[in-house]
Amino acid sequence: MEEKEILWNEAKAFIAACYQELGKEEEVKDRLADIKSEIDLTGSYVHTKEELEHGAKMAWRNSNRCIGRLFWNSLNVIDRRDVRTKEEVRDALFHHIETATNNGKIRPTITIFPPEEKGEKQVEIWNHQLIRYAGYESDGERIGDPASCSLTAACEELGWRGERTDFDLLPLIFRMKGDEQPVWYELPRSLVIEVPITHPDIEAFSDLELKWYGVPIISDMKLEVGGIHYNAAPFNGWYMGTEIGARNLADEKRYDKLKKVASVIGIAADYNTDLWKDQALVELNKAVLHSYKKQGVSIVDHHTAASQFKRFEEQEEEAGRKLTGDWTWLIPPISPAATHIFHRSYDNSIVKPNYFYQDKPYE
């Protein structure tokens, strides 16, 4: 099947579903006729603002790995298909961080840059998340976030220098079409909310000097809507506490802080049968939730998130849509058996529109 035909089939499926949901079925025929002419003439077509907005929302709703999909229809969609210069991209990314952060009352937001043209990226964002900590490794010593080591090395090759602390903010880094090298820009500190991690009952917890940033803005996935590929489309919700407390700060291949947590909460870390890891995880996660709430930054605990996902399941059934999900990602990393998600199965079929992983340009 040739490319135009594949695109036309994707467009037909999307427009039919999108317009049906928007209550505009009577407009489908005319819109598809326009799209067909456009594809025949140019090999592609351009979404209306309404199609783009609803398509991005549908993509969130179809994201099998996301437990937070109840709020799919509240997504704030920023259309920046008009950008042409590095400065415009930089300013749009700064604006995304500011509007999504919303002084701590986090707003689910996506900024959509120009789509690929004939497979060529107009804007290529290198960051995994717009806000993330650098990682350094030398002579067996690890500083910062090991998950960021390869991107940090790429930034250093381009002349960026971090302070080599555990929490250096990586710069924004992206490449424009036609440029051989990407450009980087430091993040203004005033844009980034960071939360020092303290414990509601254990004062010594603050001695660990842990912190995390407020907003997780995924920036290396591709949004696909009706056969059009928006490879640069950073998006965010808010954190579920376990993402920070049971993964980012706890994983052995990340910040690996469980032994230090055990120490400050006063338990021995000698025997697996003492369940010290479990105890340390609970206290660390309690501290994360407490700290974000104390600073007025949106966050959700995994039990509430699972209850919200139950409501999403019910909503989808009422709407007559087939629910899809990836069980291995939907179960929270601590106490999964205490959620309904653990005790049922999900169909992991991929439905479009959706978000897709892309190869990293720096690896």
Curated annotation (Swiss-Prot):
Q: Which GO terms describe its biological process?
A: nitric oxide biosynthetic process
Q: Which Pfam families match?
A: NO_synthase
Question: Which amino acids does the record list as binding heme?
Answer: 66
User: What keywords would UniProt list here?
Assistant: Heme, Iron, Metal-binding, Oxidoreductase
- Remarks, anything else? This protein is similar to the oxygenase domain of eukaryotic nitric oxide synthases but lacks the reductase domain which, in eukaryotes, is responsible for transfer of electrons to the ferric heme during nitric oxide synthesis.
Q: What is this protein called?
A: Nitric oxide synthase oxygenase
Protein family (similarity comment):
Belongs to the NOS family. Bacterial NOS oxygenase subfamily.
Cofactor binding summary note = Tetrahydrobiopterin (H4B). Can also use tetrahydrofolate (THF) in place of tetrahydrobiopterin (H4B) but binds THF with much lower affinity than H4B.
* Assigned EC number: 1.14.14.47
Its cofactor is: heme; (6R)-L-erythro-5,6,7,8-tetrahydrobiopterin
Membrane-traversing stretches = none
A molecular function annotated in GO for this UniProt entry is: nitric-oxide synthase activity
Q: Which Gene3D superfamilies match?
A: Nitric Oxide Synthase, Chain A, domain 1, Nitric Oxide Synthase, Chain A, domain 3, Nitric Oxide Synthase,Heme Domain,Chain A domain 2
Q: What is the lineage of its organism?
A: Bacteria, Bacillati, Bacillota, Bacilli, Bacillales
Reactions catalysed, semicolon-separated, are:
3 reduced [flavodoxin] + 2 L-arginine + 4 O2 = 3 oxidized [flavodoxin] + 2 L-citrulline + 2 nitric oxide + 4 H2O + 5 H(+)
Assembly and partners are described as: Homodimer.
Species the sequence originates in: Bacillus subtilis (strain 168)
- Give the function comment from the record: Catalyzes the production of nitric oxide.
